[in-house]
């Protein structure tokens, strides 16, 4: 007979353990979403009312709130174990604290398999991690065997810190090898679970023979059938049906991000393991779903240490960090310089023969800098609390690949209505821009020079319109915020990075004392006075 399987799935939760606001920031009012206590309730209800349930995570549990800064993944282990996840695929952010920060706490302490078929250890560390990262796992669900194969984005070495001894191989080739192996072992129901983005998920569904369902992540893709329940706009139906090269309809799913939804897919297989029906929708975890009291109590208990942590000294400033509105929205501000310098530092990777680094430029919208830090108050001591006042939105600094012409367009947008105190003026690092405000909007950029990367002595050189550049920027801008529609990244050119306050905090800690200056990174030419 046929076999009905219910797949519950999360991806890109990014340390949202507590419930959040509608846009996945701090929950302040009544209208709150997600959080692990609320997810626990929904999972319990579905396990009680459905026979064959799998709970899967497609990676990027790590990084995104102060929970991760403090607990470093112990919080992920604790709550994923208590929610009884069946399997997790590794995302790029699981490597943010290096291989050691992945091994312990995560790999050594979870009670479920961690999967990735396309990561190949080489050299000295191969023995340390053998047995901790599996290519696939066969799970008994009811009377049937289900094979789950994991995969992780090939971009991980550029996006995170996996170190020199892990090789990230082509997803389709590696998945095919393991799908063939599972088929040989007599497993005819196979799920690919991984973290390479929606376009790659679809390519896997199209190319890999034997894979019946693809559960993905990385691009925070929201799929929905019918009219969406909140403010996310659907990129396609749920499940998205991809026609495979061998003529099958393969359901592909993703559940947005930040634990705001719980992915819910019902799949019916015939006795040969062929998918005959697939339906479902992500479930919005809004306040109509009660938070599980036991889980909620554990969150409260663990939160106490967070509060102590956020009031500890990180470092000091010996100058006024001007993050005022009338500075950062009108001209260069030294706090903007500090933030962007920290972001470039955070993205230093292994240099190669061509480049001292893969990226040299950062931009941040002045409106995203929400508070100054006064060096005369409290001896200039900087804590995480102060940084959270400067950068309160819990955003990340992401990597975008764009053409020079697009970057120039962004700098025109930066001053298209200069003087009104709007938030789009760009603070920078690795960029020198000259504006002439006497010109018409759209024609105000006099010159735009950028720091070379393919050079042994970094120098500012003119931006080339046709060349592709990498730029670091707030996730808010990569989503087209503040009118920067030209920067709206699609999954092929945009990768999410680390939490803003943790980047700036780590930099200040490393420096001990900071004294950012006004450096003429942004200049208004005489014609505009």
Curated annotation (Swiss-Prot):
| PTM | Venom 5'-nucleotidases (or a part thereof) may be released into the venom via exosome-like vesicles. They may be attached via a GPI anchor to the membrane of these vesicles. Soluble forms of 5'-nucleotidase might be released by cleavage of the ectodomain in the exosome-like vesicles or venom gland cells.
Which residues take part in binding Zn(2+) 1? 12, 14, 60
The protein's name in its UniProt record: Snake venom 5'-nucleotidase
Q: Where is the signal peptide?
A: 1
* Database matches in Gene3D superfamilies: 3.60.21.10, 5'-Nucleotidase, C-terminal domain
Its Enzyme Commission number(s) read 3.1.3.5
The record, for PANTHER family, names: 5'-NUCLEOTIDASE (PTHR11575:SF24), 5'-NUCLEOTIDASE-RELATED (PTHR11575)
Main subcellular localisation: membrane
Q: Could you say which protein family the record assigns here?
A: Belongs to the 5'-nucleotidase family.
Sites of GPI-anchor amidated serine lipid attachment are: 525
Q: Which UniProt keywords apply?
A: Disulfide bond, Glycoprotein, GPI-anchor, Hydrolase, Lipoprotein, Membrane, Metal-binding, Nucleotide-binding, Signal, Zinc
The chemistry this enzyme catalyses reads: a ribonucleoside 5'-phosphate + H2O = a ribonucleoside + phosphate
**Expression sites (tissue/organ):** Expressed by the venom gland.
Listed as disulfide-bonded, the cysteine pairs are: 27-32, 328-333, 340-362, 452-455
The cofactors it requires, by name, are:
Zn(2+)
Biological process according to GO: AMP catabolic process
Q: Where does Zn(2+) 2 bind?
A: 12, 60, 92, 195, 218
Organism's domain of life?
Eukaryota
Describe the function of this protein. Hydrolyzes nucleotides into nucleosides. Snake venom 5'-nucleotidases are widely distributed among venomous snake taxa, but there is a lack of information about their biological activities. They have been shown to inhibit platelet aggregation. This effect may be due to the liberation of inhibitory AMP or adenosine by its action on ADP released upon initiation of aggregation. Venom 5'-nucleotidases are also known to synergistically act in vivo with other toxins like ADPases, phospholipases, and disintegrins to exert a more pronounced anti-coagulant effect.
Please give the residues making up the propeptide in this record.
526-529
In what way does this protein cross or attach to the membrane? Lipid-anchor; GPI-anchor
Give a GO molecular function annotation for the protein.
Answer: metal ion binding
Asked whether the UniProt record includes Signal among its keywords, one would answer yes
């Amino acid at each position: 007979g046929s076999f009905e399987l219910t797949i519950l799935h999360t991806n890109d939760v990014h340390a949202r353990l507590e419930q959040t606001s509608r846009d996945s920031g701090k929950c302040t009012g009544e209208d709150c979403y997600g959080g692990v206590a609320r997810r626990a309730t929904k999972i319990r209800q579905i396990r009680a009312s459905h026979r064959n349930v799998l709970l899967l995570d497609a990676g990027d549990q790590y990084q995104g709130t102060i929970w991760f800064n403090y607990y470093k993944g112990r919080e992920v282990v604790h709550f994923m174990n208590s929610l009884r996840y069946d399997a997790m695929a590794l995302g790029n952010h699981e490597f943010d604290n290096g291989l050691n920060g992945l091994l312990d706490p995560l790999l050594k302490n979870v009670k479920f398999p961690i999967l990735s078929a396309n990561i190949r250890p080489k050299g000295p560390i191969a023995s340390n991690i053998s047995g901790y990262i599996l290519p696939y796992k066969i799970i008994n669900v009811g009377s049937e065997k289900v094979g789950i194969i994991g995969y992780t984005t090939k971009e991980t070495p550029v996006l995170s810190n996996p170190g020199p001894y892990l090789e990230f191989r082509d997803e389709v080739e590696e998945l095919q090898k393991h799908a063939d192996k599972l088929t040989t072992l007599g497993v005819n129901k196979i799920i690919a679970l991984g973290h390479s983005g929606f376009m790659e998920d679809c390519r896997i569904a199209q190319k890999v023979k034997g894979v019946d369902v693809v559960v993905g992540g990385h691009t925070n893709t929201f799929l929905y059938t019918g009219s969406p329940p909140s403010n996310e706009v659907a990129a396609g139906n749920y499940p998205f049906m991809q026609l495979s090269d061998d003529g099958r309809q393969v359901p592909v799913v993703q559940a947005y991000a930040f634990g705001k939804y719980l992915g819910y897919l019902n799949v019916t297989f015939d006795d040969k393991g062929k998918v005959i029906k697939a339906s479902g929708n992500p479930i919005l975890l809004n306040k109509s779903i009660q938070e599980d009291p036991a889980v909620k109590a554990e969150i409260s208990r663990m939160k106490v240490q967070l509060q102590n942590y956020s009031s500890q000294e990180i470092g000091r400033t010996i100058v006024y960090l001007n993050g005022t509105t009338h500075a950062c929205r009108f001209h260069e501000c030294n706090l903007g310089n500090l933030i962007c310098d920290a972001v470039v530092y955070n993205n230093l990777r292994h240099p190669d023969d061509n480049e001292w680094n893969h990226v040299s430029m950062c931009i941040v919208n002045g409106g995203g800098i929400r508070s100054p830090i006064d060096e005369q108050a409290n001896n200039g001591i900087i804590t995480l609390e102060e940084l959270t006042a400067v950068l309160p939105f819990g955003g990340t600094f992401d990597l975008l690949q764009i053409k020079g012409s697009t970057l120039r367009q962004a700098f025109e947008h930066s001053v298209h209505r200069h003087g009104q105190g709007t938030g789009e003026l760009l603070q920078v690092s690795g960029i020198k821009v000259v504006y002439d405000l006497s010109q018409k909007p759209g024609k105000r950029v006099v010159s735009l020079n950028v720091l070379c990367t393919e050079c042994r002595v970094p120098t500012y050189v003119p931006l080339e319109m046709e060349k592709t550049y990498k730029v670091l920027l707030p996730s808010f801008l990569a989503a087209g915020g503040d009118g920067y529609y030209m920067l709206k990244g699609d999954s092929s050119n945009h990768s999410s990075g680390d939490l803003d306050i943790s980047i700036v905090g780590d930099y200040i800690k490393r420096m001990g004392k900071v004294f950012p200056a006004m450096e003429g990174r942004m200049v208004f030419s005489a014609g505009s006075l």
